[in-house]
Amino acid sequence: KTVEYTVETENVAEYIINVPEGWHADYADNTLAITAPAKDLCHFDKEGTVAITVVSESGKMAIVKVNVFAGEWVNEVELRILTFEDADCNGEEIGDGIYAWSEFIPTGGQYGNGHGSYWWGDYGNTEIEFTPVYGMYGAYGGHAGISNYVGSDWQNEGNFSFDLQAYNVTGGHSGTNFNTYFGYLDESGYGMMESLPPFYFWDGEARVIDHMWVTNTTYFYNQAHSAGFGSDYVISDESTFKIVAYGYESDDDTEPTVAEFYLLNVGQNFVTEWTKWDLSVLGKVTRVEFNCVGSDDMYGSYGMSVPGYFAYDDVAVQFPGETVFR
């Protein structure tokens, strides 16, 4: 970009203009034009000094300096993060009579105890809201719940009564709490619900979900090794299990964008720690639905023979930040 300055001169015999590398400057007809290097020429100096040495007709010399800086106005992105930590609650109701995330966590055993049947919202922060999906099994058709249960004894603590337990971690990704997800659809007719449990922006505004952190649950880790309900499934080096995210820009959107994350990859490679999942590839969305999909060997006469669970935390959403020149 070129910036022009009006400069009135008199009695100038000659002048020399020195510029930083990559810059250009010219003077003609009382106009000083300074041109910054192109944006893609980042190896040139972004800032420096244009020095103009002027010699008068009487032989006197003066140096005029102009400090220059090349940049652009940039709309920065603010990342707001849903942490599920009580310290980040703002005093507003986030559930039915609930004001802190830990109040959702059952203390009398993980399975049952009302989990899976409640709504929640991260109001005034990410604006993400969740309502349960009621399928053929009622509230247990989709969604598990807020949790702080963790463990690594997958052989003894890997059945359905430990369904809120994240595997092999010491807590949430950045704190104590996290969320657990349950839900899947398949073509067997024995899926747990008629639609997938989504979370969405309650105000209908389309936003970019930048990323979230995911890991396996102890329940899935156990069952992936030993499950066989309705099938002859035995884990092999070819077995896989993934989360598929579907992003919808509006309620009328019938062609969602898609992102995938493998919780179990070939070679019996399980995710056993909090791992970042880039969801920005979905673009701007008003809601996201998640499905759990196994490899063909995980399906039998009653559909998927392993539990469609995963744990997630620290959901980051992009919001407009400050406009800065840089």
What are these regions (language model features)?
Residues 44-58, 243-245:
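A short beta-strand micro-motif common to beta-rich folds, especially ectodomain repeats
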Residues 1-20, 69:
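Solvent-exposed, low-complexity, repeat-rich "mucin-like" stalks and linkers
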Residues 58-73:
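C-terminal edge beta-strand
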Residues 73-197, 204:
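N-terminal targeting leaders for non-cytosolic proteins
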